[in-house]
Amino acid sequence: MGFYMLLTVALLLTSFMSVEATPVDQAERSAMKESGLAHRIEPRYASCEAAEADCIHDDCFSEDTYTDVCQESCQYMYDNCMDD
């Protein structure tokens, strides 16, 4: 009898662990929009051309001069400007 109680408790605990946090994330995002915090976060680049100018700069091709700006601009291009 004790084994079945332990098994039931274990199954209940594992079922609670598989709950997704999507509704919580959506609630947080809507709260941020209502409070105005979402509008304060602006992307670094307004266009792909600006990101491309930073990404293909000569400094970004050298390991010694590669900076966070190079990383951010090339990542922006990869995420937003590449054709599928």
Swiss-Prot record:
One of its GO terms (cellular component) is extracellular region. Expressed by the venom duct. The keyword Signal applies. Disulfide bonds join 48-70, 55-74, 60-81. It is found in: Secreted. Residues 22-39 form a propeptide. This is Turripeptide IX-01. It comes from Gemmula speciosa. The lineage of its organism: Eukaryota, Metazoa, Spiralia, Lophotrochozoa, Mollusca.
